[in-house]
Amino acid sequence: MRIDETQKMINDYFGVMGAHGEFSQFYAEDVTWIMIDAGVETRGAAAVRDYVVALHGQMSDVHTHRIAVSEGAACLEGDCINVQKTDAPRIAYCVVYDLADNRITAMRCYGTFGAMVSQIQPADS
C-alpha cells in the first residue's frame, strides 16, 4: 500500500475505534495480535477485536504520542496507566501494524503489559 493509502486507512481505523464503532472491519480475516512481552497471540478478526476492547478496558489516561506510517506499515507510540494498579509507573508501548490490500493483517504490541495481560482472557488465541 502507498503511504497515503496507509495513512488514510489508519486514520479511518482510529476514527471508527474512537467512535466505538465496528473497527474489526479494517482487519483481514486472519489478522493477528501479538503481545510481545507476554507471548500472547490472538488470531481472527472477531477475537482480535474482543482482545483489543478488553485490553483498552484495562487502560486509563491513554496518551498517543506519535503515529508514523510507511508503505504498508504504521507504528503507534503511547503510554497509559493500568486501571488495576493506578499507583504503578505508566506503561510505555508501541504497536506496529502491517497492512495489505486495505486491511490490517498483523499487529504487534511492545511494552511492559505483563500484569495487565494476565487480567484479560482472550476469546481465541
Please identify what each model-predicted range represents.
Residues 20-72:
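A solvent-exposed, acidic/Ser-Thr-rich amphipathic alpha-helical stretch
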Residues 2, 49-125:
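A beta-strand edge to alpha-helix "cap/lid" segment located at domain peripheries
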Residues 1-26:
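Short acidic-aromatic low-complexity motifs
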